[in-house]
Amino acid sequence: MSTPHWFDQGSLVLASNNKGKVAEFEKLFEQLKLPVEIIPQGRLNIPDAIEDGLSFIENAIIKARHASKISGKPAMADDSGICVPVLGGAPGIYSARYAGEHGDDAANNAKLLNDLLPFRKNGEAIEGMFVCVLALVTHAEDPLPQIFQGIWHGEILEAPRGENGFGYDPLFWLPELQVSSAELSKEDKNKISHRGQAMQLFRESLQK
């Protein structure tokens, strides 16, 4: 296993102020046992970037560059959300502010359920997928950001289930396990989730 040169800087900024994401990432990075300190951007008083991209990849890169520019350190950003094909992929990149106010999970869930009412027919399942894109930049103007993408397929429930997780987890049903994402432990979720998948690709990149 070769050592990435950004390891030499001794730290990596995690470009997120979302407490739920930060908690999941801290657990995932703990499992990786990287020889670098992982610093959530909030500890450096880095404000959220303006996410004006049109895709998960664009927004992840924007956030990573923003954190790296302010901190002067390598940075990793996550852009993620839930996509529902019958809604044309919505909420998509607007998942965190689907109902208008950023980070209002209850309102976002309620809006998604309401928007899906016209599509509920004869108990048919409505497909959904969680998407996570990780972008790693070694410096703010890195011309070759590393991109890692995970997609987690499931269905959208008619009512919330479970108390764990955050965001749309209570509405995300895993038919093969017969549980919602919010009924999984953090450890079990990280093994199979969109974010866990993307982190696994990141882990594999470190072994090349």
Curated annotation (Swiss-Prot):
Q: Does the keyword Magnesium apply?
A: yes
* InterPro entries per the UniProt record, alphabetical: dITP/XTP_pyrophosphatase, ITPase-like_fam, RdgB/HAM1
Binding residue positions for substrate: 16-21, 80, 166-169, 189, 194-195
Named cofactor requirement(s): Mg(2+)
Q: Does the keyword Hydrolase apply?
A: yes
**Catalytic residue list:** 79 (proton acceptor)
Annotated SUPFAM superfamilies:
ITPase-like
Where is Mg(2+) annotated to bind? 79
Q: Which leading EC class covers this enzyme?
A: hydrolase
Name the chemical reaction catalysed here. Answer: XTP + H2O = XMP + diphosphate + H(+); dITP + H2O = dIMP + diphosphate + H(+); ITP + H2O = IMP + diphosphate + H(+)
Q: Alphabetically list the UniProt keywords.
A: Hydrolase, Magnesium, Metal-binding, Nucleotide metabolism, Nucleotide-binding
Cellular component GO terms, alphabetically? cytosol
| Entries under NCBIfam families matching the protein | RdgB/HAM1 family non-canonical purine NTP pyrophosphatase (TIGR00042)
Q: Which family does it belong to?
A: Belongs to the HAM1 NTPase family.
* SUBUNIT field: Homodimer.
Instruction: From the Swiss-Prot or TrEMBL record, give the protein name.
Output: dITP/XTP pyrophosphatase
